[in-house]
């Protein structure tokens, strides 16, 4: 049964009231943004908003921002096996994924506090009847949403990846002119992030490599960064390895802005302007969430 079918028969409204209530009680966030954050533990940033799709149009600005941050701060459960196959400890990936849900909400609320009254599903508030004739009609509409989202995401990714490649090409040309070899956007960010990696608890001698990996994750994606990590894993101490693995565990990269614009914008076109306006801020908040998880992991492992 697809998500649209579950909404049609009323199952999703019950799930929102119950599952979303757990994080709501702990953090004081709304049911819908809490459920979206929880869903990101199991599915990707493109699929999680579908869980609260009927509520997207009526979400407050803070709730919408929290949905965006939650998607970027986490990784999909379906990709964990792939990362584990690279040699990344599965227990670290699982811990980072579960920490991303409250961490993403925390950073989202710090950067975009709630100033409006959210919809209260626990009181029966929410969208009106969906208007579908039966389950088949609801399933067909859900399938069309999926195809529309996939096409929009593909188009946005092509544009963003092309833009990043253009910037790297320009930096490479500038480097050759001024005698700087292998100048790239991720390399520049690696130098920038070296002090940050040191602040997270990575020794200065290892901070350059750690900062470079964080830069690769931000500019490219976490998969590329994890592959690069496996090639230099021997350079890190156990605590540094944990910090790096936690810092890389999230979809917080430039391409994710394209995925949000294409995916979330396709199912909530009335909020597209806000989604595009919040893209970089959501990326910053999600990155801070990942770095906070990394710092906590390094602290507890060093104490153990």
Could you say what each language-model-derived stretch is?
Residues 1-3:
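Short, small-residue-biased leader/transition segments that mark boundaries at the very start
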Residues 14-28, 36-40, 54, 137-148, ...:
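Short amphipathic alpha-helical coupling elements at transmembrane boundaries
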Residues 17-51, 118-138, 183-189, 213, ...:
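Juxtamembrane inter-helical linkers in multi-pass membrane proteins
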Residues 26-84, 210-296:
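Alpha-helical membrane segments and immediately flanking helix-loop junctions
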Residues 92-107, 242-250:
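Alpha-helical transmembrane segments
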Residues 98-149:
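Long, contiguous bundles of hydrophobic transmembrane helices that form the permeation core
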Residues 144-233:
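Transmembrane helical segments that form the transport core of multi-pass membrane transport proteins
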Residues 296-304:
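Juxtamembrane boundary at the C-terminal end of a transmembrane helix
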């Amino acid at each position: 049964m697809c998500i649209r079918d579950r909404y049609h028969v009323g199952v999703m409204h019950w799930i929102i009231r119950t599952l979303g209530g757990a994080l709501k009680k702990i953090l004081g966030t709304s049911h819908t943004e809490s459920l979206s954050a929880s869903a990101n533990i199991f599915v990707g940033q493109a699929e999680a908003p579908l869980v609260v799709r009927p509520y997207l149009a009526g979400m407050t600005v803070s709730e919408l921002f929290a949905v965006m941050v939650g998607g970027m701060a986490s990784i999909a459960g379906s990709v964990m096996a792939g990362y584990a196959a690279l040699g990344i400890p599965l227990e670290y990936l699982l811990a980072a994924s579960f920490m991303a849900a409250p961490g993403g909400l925390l950073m989202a609320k710090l950067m975009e506090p709630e100033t409006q009254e959210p919809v209260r599903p626990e009181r029966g508030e929410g969208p009106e009847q969906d208007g579908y004739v039966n389950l088949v009609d609801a399933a067909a509409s859900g399938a069309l949403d999926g195809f529309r989202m996939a096409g929009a995401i593909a188009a946005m990714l092509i544009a963003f990846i092309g833009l990043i490649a253009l910037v790297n090409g320009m930096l490479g040309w500038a480097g050759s002119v001024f005698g700087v070899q292998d100048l790239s956007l991720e390399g520049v960010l690696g130098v920038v992030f070296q002090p940050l990696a040191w602040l997270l608890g990575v020794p200065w001698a290892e901070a350059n490599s750690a900062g470079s990996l964080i830069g690769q994750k931000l500019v490219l994606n976490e998969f590329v960064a994890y592959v690069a990590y496996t090639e230099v894993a021997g350079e890190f101490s156990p605590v540094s390895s944990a910090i790096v693995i936690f810092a890389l565990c999230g979809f917080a990269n430039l391409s994710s802005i394209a995925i949000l614009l294409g995916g979330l914008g396709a199912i909530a076109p009335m909020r597209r302007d806000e989604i595009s306006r919040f893209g970089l801020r959501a990326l910053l908040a999600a990155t801070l969430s990942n770095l906070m998880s990394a710092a906590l992991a390094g602290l507890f492992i060093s104490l153990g």
